[in-house]
């Protein structure tokens, strides 16, 4: 059974914030890795018989070029931040606000000045690369922009490219794992500080703001995503937003949040109890904890050689079976987990819609089963885990306890 713990963790229990030397080492590691990253993309381009790749997602641009255009949100880049890769060149499109930054961060790239009228410069861009067929991030480029580019250079064929860079980013390099680990430690310390200050009568917004302050002053460059702080029945909203609702004794308090460190993100959910847990919520917590343990145990068994490496769908099924057996299958609608890195949601997907292929390695993903009773209560427990076939066990990167914790009293 999950322990009921009355003592609370201390921020000093967790890894210290990254140092300047850590960040310098990560920058060097990225620079050394980029030629290999670009080669993999160019191999895909050659296999698809395309002359260039047109990308617009900010984390893809950072991964391939080093140019950082990121405000802490997963997003599609604007006109500054679009890029082209050919067999010989990398071209960054940047307006006057970012030219100096792009030149410094991506020294091997050609920087092209752009305005908000990309179609106007598109013909000369593709001509300068000798491109007759261009692969385009089809899931991200709008129908409108696709049509504009076709009309601007009708002699250039646009080809849909789906998941080309994502497929490479799912396998994490050592320096990427280090940064995710550091982001997890920032989150661990921040929550350890906040749980000591929770009191009945505080609002969700007050606690979310306090947690954000701890994250930003504790070594993070930004939030990984907007904080969810949900009290009582609001915890039944898997992606709810903080409100003026107050914390009350006898109810749950759910935090879902993450830190971003040098571009890489963490993601953690903890469900706490204000005072003594009521029997219903405590029982639900036990089920969710058992479901998470079952999924991680399935991963562990593969690394020990007891079972084959599971697919994302199988890892999800292990957690889902526990919740369904407890009679709450209809109260667990989302997937068990998702990959994470430069974006909050990446491959692999641990869900009923996940791939049937064995999970890649090494990779980092969340394991986050939950049970949600509409208008009543909700419980989710989320950890990031490192799945690495070279290891003997799955490593939890988020280390804040998953025991039943009572706070606010």
Regions found by a protein language model. Give the residues of each.
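Active-site neighborhoods and metal-handling regions in enzymes and metal-associated proteins
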Residues: 1-409
């Amino acid at each position: 059974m999950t322990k009921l713990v009355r003592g609370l963790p201390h921020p000093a229990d967790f890894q210290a914030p990254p140092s300047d030397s850590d960040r310098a080492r990560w920058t060097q590691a990225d620079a050394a890795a980029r030629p290999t990253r670009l080669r993999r993309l160019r191999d895909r381009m050659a296999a698809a018989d395309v002359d260039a790749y047109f990308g617009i997602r900010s984390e893809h641009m950072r991964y391939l070029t080093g140019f950082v255009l990121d405000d802490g949100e997963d997003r599609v880049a604007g006109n500054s931040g679009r890029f082209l890769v050919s067999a010989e060149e990398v071209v960054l499109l940047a307006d006057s606000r970012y030219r100096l930054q792009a030149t410094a961060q991506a020294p091997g790239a050609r920087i092209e000045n752009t305005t908000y009228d990309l179609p106007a410069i598109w013909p000369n861009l593709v001509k300068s690369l000798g491109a007759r067929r261009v692969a385009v991030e089809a899931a991200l480029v709008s129908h409108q922009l696709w049509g504009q580019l076709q009309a601007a250079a009708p002699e250039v064929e646009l080809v849909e490219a789906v998941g080309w860079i994502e497929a490479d980013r799912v396998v994490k390099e050592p320096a990427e794992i280090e940064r995710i680990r550091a982001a997890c430690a920032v989150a661990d310390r921040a929550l350890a500080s906040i749980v000591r200050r929770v009191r009945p009568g505080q609002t969700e917004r007050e606690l979310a703001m306090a947690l954000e302050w701890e994250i930003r002053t504790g070594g993070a460059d930004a939030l990984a995503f907007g904080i969810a702080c949900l009290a009582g029945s609001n915890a039944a909203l898997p992606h709810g937003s903080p409100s003026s609702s107050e914390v009350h004794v006898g109810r749950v308090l759910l935090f879902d949040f993450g830190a971003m460190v040098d571009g890489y993100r963490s993601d953690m959910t903890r469900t706490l109890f204000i005072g003594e847990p009521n029997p219903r919520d405590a029982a639900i917590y036990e089920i969710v904890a058992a479901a998470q343990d079952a999924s991680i145990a399935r991963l562990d068994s593969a690394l020990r050689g007891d079972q084959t490496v599971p697919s994302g769908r199988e890892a999800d099924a292990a957690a889902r079976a526990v919740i369904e057996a407890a009679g709450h299958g209809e109260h667990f609608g989302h997937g068990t987990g998702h990959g994470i890195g430069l974006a909050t949601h990446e491959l692999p997907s641990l869900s009923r819609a996940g791939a049937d292929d064995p999970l890649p390695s090494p990779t980092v993903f969340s394991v986050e089963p939950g049970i949600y009773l509409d208008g009543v209560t909700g419980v989710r427990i989320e950890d990031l885990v490192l799945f690495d076939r070279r290891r003997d066990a799955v490593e939890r990167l988020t280390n804040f306890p998953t025991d039943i914790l009572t706070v606010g009293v």
